[in-house]
Amino acid sequence: MEREEAERLVEAHGQAVYRLAYARTASRADAEDIVQETFLRLVRQSPEFRDDEHCRAWLLRVAANCAGDLFRSPWRRRIRPLEEAGALTAPEPEGEGDGAVAAVLALPERYRAVIHLFYYEEMSVAEIASILGLREGTVRTRLSRARDKLRAMLEGTEGTHV
């Protein structure tokens, strides 16, 4: 793959890949690692794509697979997050500490991913199923359960604002 083409694809799809990786991991560092690995695989494999949407779907599928690999890695199972170890947590980035975004980030990973792809990337249930390697019924179930959890979280916090 030519350098210019790789740079164009990073420019065109890098943010979508990052957002999915962040939705899956809730960690900026892990998301950045996944983005890097995704585009390295693109350059190494140089697959042929029918169109830009096919390329985007391929990149998101690879990113989802990389996130799964991260969760299954022996290193990941041995380490504990700093928050669990009693270290101070970093301040929330502006805008992520309130409302719906914080509620989405508080969801379990399997729900964060489908919510992100459905609402933020505007993908269909069929596209999400393909990218995450799930059945369409599973995606619909996860979307429904995620919406219920979000509704409960957001309704529980409405009365706490001054």
Predicted regions and their residues:
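Internal acidic/polar
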Residues: 69, 77-104, 124
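Residues within helix-turn-helix
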Residues: 29, 126, 137
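Residues within the DNA-recognition helix of helix-turn-helix
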Residues: 13, 34, 142-145
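A short pre-motif secondary-structure segment
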Residues: 114-118
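DNA-recognition helix of helix-turn-helix
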Residues: 64, 68, 132-156
